[in-house]
């Protein structure tokens, strides 16, 4: 479950604070789909970055907290913003609206997939076994495993976005935060 309690954020600018989120409260339960809609600039991306704990100057949390709790691999966990541990990111993933902000353009995709998998989740696999699991997952998403040999700059915008979605969902996180995930994707007719 992802729980937000009295969350307020603002951008600290020279000419004053710009408040973005004000006393936000909600809960997202396991297996629940939760959508956020609003006009451009209303704070949707700021909220997602705050939930993923990407707090970068000049953005600050003024008050409130984010709590992530659940179970993964048979073990319970609970984390609170401000006390984030590395394992927070093993349980939550983020799909940005711009794939180029996540993918390293000069590193092959197979290395980027391998680097995104925590060592403890490799289950004593060899690199080849892990890549075989990745290839099988890509096939389930109708992506060719051959794409692993590619560099992101060689792919179209839509293909990069599909790779980001695959990266974000491969480890079956408890929560997937998606910021306009269909950006650059083709409409299927």
Residue locations for each model-derived region?
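Conserved signature/switch motifs of ABC ATPase nucleotide-binding domains
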Residues: 171, 189
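Conserved ABC ATPase signature
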Residues: 151-155, 159
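The feature captures the beta-strand-to-loop junction immediately N-terminal to the Walker
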Residues: 37-39
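ABC ATPase NBD coupling module
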Residues: 72-93, 111, 119
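A short, flexible loop at the N-terminus of ABC-type nucleotide-binding domains that lies
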Residues: 1, 10-23, 54-59, 81-83, ...
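Conserved ABC ATPase "signature" region
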Residues: 126-146, 174
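Catalytic Walker B motif of ABC-type/P-loop ATPase nucleotide-binding domains
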Residues: 176-179
């Amino acid at each position: 479950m992802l729980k937000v309690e009295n969350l307020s954020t603002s951008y600290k600018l020279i000419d004053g604070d710009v408040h973005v989120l004000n006393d936000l409260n909600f809960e997202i339960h396991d297996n629940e789909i939760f959508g956020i809609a609003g006009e451009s600039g209303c704070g949707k991306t700021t909220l997602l970055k705050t939930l993923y704990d990407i707090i970068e100057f000049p953005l600050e949390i003024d008050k409130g907290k984010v709590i992530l709790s659940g179970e993964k691999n048979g073990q319970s966990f609970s984390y609170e913003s401000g006390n984030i541990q590395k394992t927070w990111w093993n349980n939550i993933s983020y799909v940005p609206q711009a794939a180029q902000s996540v993918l390293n353009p000069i590193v092959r995709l197979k290395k980027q997939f391998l680097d995104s998998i925590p060592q403890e989740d490799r289950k004593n696999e060899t690199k080849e076994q892990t890549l075989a699991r990745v290839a099988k997952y890509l096939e389930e998403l109708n992506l060719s495993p051959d794409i692993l040999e590619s560099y992101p700059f060689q792919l179209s915008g839509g293909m990069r976005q599909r790779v980001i979605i695959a990266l974000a969902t491969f480890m079956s996180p408890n929560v997937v935060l998606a910021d306009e995930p269909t950006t650059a994707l083709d409409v299927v007719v």
